[in-house]
Amino acid sequence: MKNFKLNLVALPIALLSFSVVLSACQTEPKQVKTSQSSTQEKIQPPSTESTKESTKSEEKVQMTFTTGSLIQAVSEGDFDQTKEILNSPAYLIDEVNEKSETPLLIAVYQNQIPITKLLIDAGANINQQDVIQDSPYLYAGAQGRTEILAYMLAHTTPDQSVYNRFGGNALIPAAEKGHLENVKLLLADKRVAIDHQNKFGYTALIEAVGLRDGSQIYQEIVAELLRNGANSSLRDNSGRTALDYANQLGYGNIAQMLRTANS
């Protein structure tokens, strides 16, 4: 009877313990489920949008061109490739080759007008010189690249303190080589020094007379220089003026123009 009483006392305690255990078992799956849900959220694959962004980023990296690629494209006259490089995230527009020639100078050398304009619009330096002291601006003036010169004068700022290897500006060789249209462009622009003297003391006027043949084109160049105020009394390192050369070489028409200018 005593044992029966003890069992009656212990029974509620056992039932209570069983209830606690059962309650714990019922809540356990909920905790596991929550944990699984959290893990699943963390390892979900990237969205389509993020994949697209990643692909774009990789494409940008691939479009970064190596040093020398712009020079190569310009040297080959490849307009589309040049444009593609200029539209890329990173490039060196004034990179140089072993002769210190920039892409722009090479384009001017080759008279590649569309590529030259493309490079100028992208900010290429028209004053940077190579190992023989040619610059895009000086070369365009000296070698009759009239359309290129006109574009430079309209869209950039030539540095008039940068001279060629003979100490001359763009006007002197333009006059000496018979590029009348370049002479007109430079004089109309008014930024070039009309009476600048190079290492030999030559001005554009002296070279147009003393170093050439006195033909019609040089008569027109002399007239253009005089019309724009060229000083005909300046002397070169040998002490001679443009009129001295005209008389010495028998250029009658030019001599007459110079005498009229001096009177």
Give the positions of each predicted feature.
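Ankyrin repeat A-helix N-terminal signature
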Residues: 72-77, 106-112, 139-145, 173-179, ...
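Bacterial signal peptide processing site
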Residues: 26-28
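Conserved ankyrin/ankyrin-like repeat signature
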Residues: 81, 114-115, 147-148, 181-182, ...
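C-terminal motif of bacterial Sec signal peptides marking the signal peptidase cleavage site
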Residues: 22-24
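Leucine-rich solenoid repeat scaffolds
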Residues: 232-262
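Ankyrin repeat domain, specifically the short helix-to-loop turn at the C-terminus of the second helix
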Residues: 86-91, 117-125, 150-158, 184-193, ...
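Ankyrin repeat boundary signal
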Residues: 93-96, 126-129, 159-163, 194-197, ...
